[in-house]
Regions:
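Residue-level detector of anion-binding/catalytic polar loops
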Residues: 87, 250, 305, 453
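Walker B catalytic acidic pair
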Residues: 310
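Short glycine-rich anion-binding loops that position phosphate/pyrophosphate groups of nucleotides
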Residues: 147, 278-282, 341, 476
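Conserved core of the PLP fold type I
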Residues: 161-303, 314-328, 332-334, 401, ...
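N-terminal basic, amphipathic alpha-helical segments
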Residues: 1-162, 363, 367-373, 382-385, ...
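Conserved core segment of the aminotransferase class I/II
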Residues: 157, 334-398
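A short linear hydrophobic-aromatic micro-motif
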Residues: 418-421, 453-459
Length: 500
């Protein structure tokens, strides 16, 4: 049984006026008797979720004594609720909530309708619209940003958690180091050395609640140091840009072409820091070329600061791994990564490495935010990293993600040959462009109307670019990918001018 229902039923044994804040004195000031008042109060509690289906009402004798009213008042109210179908009586279970009130029987907040495409697909959405679309249901979800969540290693996680708890000291349940659990920071340094070529001391690592919090910490720390202008890639992640702007940071756009971020444009931006995704640029999938890396590091040596978002570098299929910028210039690069694309974003665990001059301020900023991440998940993740279970999981999902990527590429070539495809050599998404001037927002809205959720490329652009879509494939089965691309192609054809 649902725990919330169990809690309600436990209260019901004692009478529940404390739970619903029932006050019979209020009823005497209203038209109608006490039974009318009690019926209305119970209906309101059902409608707003305080009494979910399956929860038990207190016995009439108990509730009457609690409210100091006659038992007949409660019995009559229960009878009326039963006649209207809101409750049902069981010999042993007592009186149980059966359903919400029928329309018109109770003044209750109207349930929210499913969002319409017109409400979701704005030309320039803010974070609220972006989050609303992320959570909006769709028959086929091709929204980027998720790994295959069905592959989450539940058995390995449970084994690791049992192992950790067996050695968990009472002192471990207290307030920990705001930088993170030492065992996890050590495991992170070994993981980064093994997978990203980064050599770091555990003391350099700050555990954060994902890259989003890493950016919030950096915005605060760099702002204190007088850096309030951080250039961002264009196109580049809308979510990251919104996170920086929420902290009052100016985010001038810097063009990304087929070789990555254009460093000459970065110099012209007059920004003293830049946020970028060099290993697998979001959303284009471009890898920063060797020549651009040298130019960028030269810019950093002249006083610039690089913020490296290494969000999905472990997922690669058709190319060799790309070295992290942090591995080359640790005093010029802030590095952020997480387990969101490795395991699941719901874990809210990531890591941040900063140049030594910012480290103390970053630790204090993290401490002031939340006193540090939860310790138990950190220790479980440390065990997964050190035992090899996380490496095994990564190998498994790489194969699965690759099959899904291949299915999407084949479907796009078959159904949408007009689209230019790029960024498919690594990651969890790819990008397509169109050359006919079609509005990508209109196309995404039309696809959503057919039950397919995709992301317009223009949402991630601050300056005009070719229209396109960002398509996630890692979290979607092959058959659904094929169906989704077919429906997307139908939407594309429907938006073409007549006669074409």
């Amino acid at each position: 049984m649902n725990r919330s229902i169990e809690a309600i039923n436990e209260r019901a044994k004692r009478g529940f006026s404390d739970f619903l804040q029932l006050d019979p004195s209020r009823a005497r000031a209203r038209a109608g008797g006490l039974s009318d008042w009690l019926v209305g109060e119970v209906r309101r509690a059902i409608a707003d979720g305080r009494l979910p289906t399956g929860s038990r009402l207190p016995a009439s004798r108990v509730l009457a004594a609690e409210l100091q009213v006659s038992r007949g008042v409660v019995t009559e109210a229960y009878q009326r609720l039963s006649e209207n179908g809101q409750v049902v009586g069981h010999a042993r279970a007592g009186t149980v909530i059966a359903a919400v009130p029928a329309p018109g029987q109770e003044d209750r907040p109207a349930s929210k309708a499913a969002p319409e495409a017109a409400d979701l697909f704005e030309p320039a959405p803010g974070a609220a619209t972006f989050d609303l679309l992320r959570s909006a249901p769709a028959a086929i979800d091709l929204f980027p940003g998720l790994p295959d969540l069905t592959a989450f290693p539940r058995s390995a996680w449970l084994r690791a958690e049992r192992t950790v708890l067996a050695d968990f000291a009472a002192a471990d349940l207290g307030y920990g180091d705001p930088s993170g659990a030492p065992a996890f920071r050590l495991a992170v340094t070994r993981w980064l050395a093994r997978n990203r070529g980064i050599q770091a001391d555990p003391a350099e690592v700050i555990i954060v609640a994902g890259v989003a919090q890493a950016l919030a910490v950096l915005a605060r720390v760099l702002g204190q140091a007088g850096i309030t202008r951080i250039a961002v890639e264009d196109p580049g992640s809308l979510g990251a840009r919104e996170q920086l702007r929420a902290w009052g940071v100016d985010t001038p756009p810097v063009l990304v072409d087929d070789a990555g971020l254009v460093v000459e444009h970065l110099r012209r931006s007059a920004a003293s820091a830049v946020l970028m995704t060099p290993a697998h640029q979001f959303p284009t999938g471009v890898v920063l070329s060797g020549e651009r890396r040298r130019e960028l590091l030269g810019w950093a040596e002249d006083g610039g600061l690089i913020i490296e978002d290494d969000y999905d570098a472990e997922h690669r299929y058709d190319r060799a791994p790309v070295a992290s910028l942090r591995a080359v210039a640790p005093e010029r690069v802030c590095y952020a990564g997480s387990v969101s694309k490795l395991l699941a974003p719901a874990l809210r665990v990531g890591w941040l490495l900063v140049p030594s001059r910012y480290h103390r301020a970053a630790v204090l900023a993290k401490r002031d935010t939340d006193l540090g991440n939860a310790v138990l998940p950190q220790l479980v993740l440390a065990h997964l990293m050190e035992s090899g279970d996380l490496d095994r999981h990564l190998r498994l999902v790489r194969r699965r993600h690759r099959r899904r990527r291949d299915a999407m590429i084949a479907a796009l070539r078959r159904e949408l040959p007009e689209a230019r495809l790029q960024g498919a050599a690594a990651g969890l998404h790819l990008m397509i462009n169109f050359t006919d001037g079609l509005s990508d927002v209109d196309l995404a809205a039309a696809a959503f109307g057919r039950g397919v959720k995709v992301q317009p490329l223009s949402w991630h652009c601050q300056t005009p670019h070719q229209p396109g879509l960002v398509l996630g494939y890692a979290a979607t089965p092959v058959r659904a990918i094929e169906q989704g691309v077919s429906l997307l192609a139908e939407s594309y054809r429907d938006l073409q001018p007549a006669g074409e």
